[in-house]
Amino acid sequence: MKYILAILVLLMVACKPDKKYHASEKLQSGSAAIKDIVAFQKELDATFKNPNSSPLPDRFRKDFEGLDFFAPDTTYVVKARFERTPDAVPFLMPSTTDEKTREIVYGIAHFQLNGVEHQLEIYQSLDLISQKQYRDYLFLPFLDETNGAETYGGGRYIDLTIPEGDTITIDFNKAYNPYCVYNKKYSCPLVPRQNYLRTSVRAGVKAFVKD
């Protein structure tokens, strides 16, 4: 979350960076992974309840009890082969507004999920790497077959860090919605079509329903 909040700041919207959420580079045991996922959910709920960090307008935040998450499921914690792309060309990633962020494909994750082989591009923000606290941050936006029904139609995000070796752990239980889902004042990067997963990812934050 800290990574994408920083991107939102760069897109000239009013938001305040908060604590980061990213997958551990060491695949955890089932019980430890579940505890980690639950801790992530609690911390994300706390962020949304806090008036200084919440993307929710006051009219929604005052009655906010918690986000709607899928139940923690370690099936969606995958250890992917990480293919670095040192020759990738920088590009401008469009957003939900006229603003764009400067990104580069840092690498490609190759993994199996739900019995199918997949790959996702993982990005690094060229606008953030000059800042010490974001030098190791990577951004993974993705689409899947739950979008538009169980989850937000525009896809979700996951924050990662640069791995030391040739594998990277992706915990889809830590997938969260772009902030523009909750408040149109935010400008959010659009998920590239090549990051569409042809499977249902029933993990992470569900679609936001305004009561």
Residue ranges of predicted features:
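Positively charged n-region of N-terminal signal peptides that target proteins for export
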Residues: 1-4
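Bacterial signal peptide processing site
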Residues: 16-19
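C-terminal partner/receptor-binding element of secreted or periplasmic proteins
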Residues: 186-211
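Post-signal-peptide N-terminal segment of Sec-exported extracytoplasmic proteins
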Residues: 32-69
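Mid-length scaffold segments of soluble, non-membrane domains
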Residues: 86-153
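C-terminal motif of bacterial Sec signal peptides marking the signal peptidase cleavage site
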Residues: 11-14
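Mid-to-C-terminal functional-domain signal that highlights helix-capping/loop sites
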Residues: 158-160, 176
